[in-house]
Amino acid sequence: MTRMVQCAKLGKEAEGLDFPPLPGELGKRIYESISKEAWQAWLKQQTMLINENRLNMADPRARQYLMKQTEKFFFGEGADTAQGYVPPSA
């Protein structure tokens, strides 16, 4: 049976994640209140941040930056956006 959550990002009930996507308290919080749809949106955003900012994921500072952006994306005022990015129009 599909696990449903009240998604904090999307503001609606949606299919929940199958397992915590990150270790620690943040991973638990995301698992309990973020949907698969919202997690996929974060993965796209994260990829843009890594590429546009040329983050080296072997650098602890880059990983710390992404963890802060993850928390801001789901539970804060929103993550940083890539410089000059214009979302495609529908």
UniProtKB/Swiss-Prot annotation:
Disulphide bond pairs: none
Organism: Paraburkholderia xenovorans (strain LB400)
UniProt GO cellular component terms: cytosol
Family membership: Belongs to the Fe(2+)-trafficking protein family.
Function: Could be a mediator in iron transactions between iron acquisition and iron-requiring processes, such as synthesis and/or repair of Fe-S clusters in biosynthetic enzymes.
GO biological process: cellular response to oxidative stress
Superkingdom in the source lineage: Bacteria
HAMAP family referenced in this protein's UniProt entry, alphabetically: Fe_traffic_YggX
Gene Ontology MF: a single term: iron ion binding
Keywords recorded for this protein, A-Z: Iron
Stored PANTHER family: FE(2+)-TRAFFICKING PROTEIN-RELATED
Pfam families for the chain: Iron_traffic
Protein known as: Probable Fe(2+)-trafficking protein
